[in-house]
Amino acid sequence: MKLTDAICVFTTSISTNMCSITAILNDQGTPEEMRSNALQISKLQRHRGPDWSGVYQNDSAVLVHERLAIVDVTSGSQPLIDPEHQTALAVNGEIYNHKNIRKSTANYPYQTGSDCEVILALYREKGAELVNDLEGMFAFVLFDPRDQSWIIARDSIGIIPLY
């Protein structure tokens, strides 16, 4: 999807037992302004991700992830990056069928044991249609720097709020 206006995306919940993501996309500000704005917003959610705080940035996108580790506690830091295409992904949630997806996408060069990394593998194969293969509770922002496109999605029930 491409828009000319800046987009700010975040997840939030009354519960503190979940990660949070913040994304600023298509902003016309400087990279420094975008990063500063994203970090200010994300700082308000930091209590929800005591295990890790990670940032991805390029000239037109910033993704910030505050992580509460559930699966792959040692190496599942986010945002996750596709090592070949440089696609960036920030996810809040859990992909229940990640083991089956990992088997069916065995050619993808997995870097972690994170259940969420299967989203990057599916994106390579299916583009935006990847969401049809996911089972679980999730919200995510995926940014593809090759064409400056992005996907913003959540589970069909909306267990993880996305704004």
PLM region spans:
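N-terminus-centric sequence/structural signature that marks the extreme N-terminus
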Residues: 15-163
